[in-house]
A protein has these predicted regions:
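N-terminal cap/lid segment of alpha/beta-hydrolase-fold proteins
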Residues: 28-61
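The serine-hydrolase catalytic nucleophile loop
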Residues: 76-88, 103, 249-250
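Glycine-rich nucleophile elbow surrounding the catalytic serine of serine-hydrolase chemistry
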Residues: 145-155
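The alpha/beta-hydrolase serine catalytic core
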Residues: 49, 151, 161-304
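Alpha/beta-hydrolase fold nucleophile elbow
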Residues: 136-147
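Catalytic nucleophile-loop/oxyanion-hole region of alpha/beta-hydrolase
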Residues: 78-80, 106-138, 287-288
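Conserved alpha/beta-hydrolase
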Residues: 88-110
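Active-site glycine-rich loops that stabilize anionic/oxyanionic intermediates
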Residues: 65, 72-77
Length: 306
């Protein structure tokens, strides 16, 4: 009888210790600080790519490390208009790594802006994914793209594959050359004239940069919404209420394309007061836009990457 009592006491104590150990381990995981973002240089097909990596805190043993690549827009940078760093921190808190890079001629890139083409940016995204896989062992991968970065993200799965989900912020997804409508939203014939001159002479100066004829040609030959339908990936789409540089037709066609997907969703209402860059002159509105953009994007990516 005493032996049975001692045995029960032993197992009870052992169970309590095990439960306590699990609680301590869970607490330590929650308290593990997210590592600071790290600027890195990624080997690319044309030279170095300047990027920033954000890793999560300690992962459970054997848990796969998901990855999100953040793609900025035309003449932008890896800051993503101030949205990318806080988004990366939020994703890290959910156990998701990110890499955000400067595309050719943008940010810290030492290439001329004429190297800013869809094919070069596609190569750079692929190089960034390969770097993250080889350096950190990342697995399932999603793309977040804003504006022209959203067009790139829409096209990438069809061209290279290996993508689990897409989050598109105000993508410039007009079919063909309509994707460049932002250069002169009031007069598309002026955009066509720019394209003709750039393709004839090699480049054209507009928006304060030299845009290559190759970019115009690649835009003319691409249809991102058709690519979305073909890839049929889980896709989040957002547009604001004051896009300004994207036509109603582009927005309507892209919304229809995404909503036709099995796991496509368009979220518009939280961004009704924002401009194309999800900003506002009113500080409180700008903060609310950023918060809604991050929360919407993180929830979607966690659903499909974790």
């Amino acid at each position: 009888m005493h032996k049975q009592t001692h045995k029960r006491a032993f197992y009870t104590l052992a169970g309590c210790i095990a439960a306590l150990a699990l609680c301590v381990a869970a607490s330590l995981f929650l308290l593990t600080p997210t590592p600071k973002a790290q600027d890195v240089t990624i080997p690319g097909t044309r030279g170095d790519i300047y990027a920033t990596v954000q890793l999560p805190g300690k992962l459970a043993r054997g848990e796969e490390l998901p990855l999100v690549v953040l793609c900025h827009g035309f003449t932008g940078s890896r800051s993503g208009d101030g949205h990318f760093a806080p988004l990366a921190a939020d994703l890290a808190a959910q156990g998701i790594a990110t890499v955000r890079l400067d595309f050719p001629g943008c940010g810290n890139s030492i290439e001329p802006f004429t190297a800013y083409t869809l094919s070069n940016m596609t190569d750079d995204v692929e190089s960034a994914i390969t770097y993250m896989q080889q350096t950190y062992g990342t697995g399932r991968t999603a793309l977040v793209g804003h504006s022209m970065g959203g067009r790139l993200a829409s096209l990438y799965p069809q061209r290279r594959g290996g993508i689990t989900a897409l989050a598109l912020w105000s993508p410039a997804n007009g079919a063909g050359l309509r994707g460049m409508e932002f250069l002169n939203i009031d007069d598309f014939s002026a955009v066509e004239a720019l394209a003709a001159e750039a393709e004839a002479s090699g480049s054209i100066s507009t928006w304060g940069v030299d845009v290559s004829g190759t970019l115009f040609t690649e835009m003319r030959d691409s249809d991102p919404n058709a690519a979305l339908r073909e890839s049929a990936l889980p896709t989040l789409l957002t547009y604001t209420g004051h896009e300004g540089i994207l036509s109603d037709t582009t927005q309507a066609e892209t919304i229809a394309a995404v909503e036709s997907l099995p796991d496509g969703r368009a979220v518009l209402e939280p961004f009704a007061e924002g401009n194309h860059n999800y900003l506002s002159e009113d500080a409180a509105t700008a903060a609310a836009l950023d918060k809604a953009l991050r929360e919407t994007t993180v929830a979607f990516l966690v659903e499909y990457l974790k």
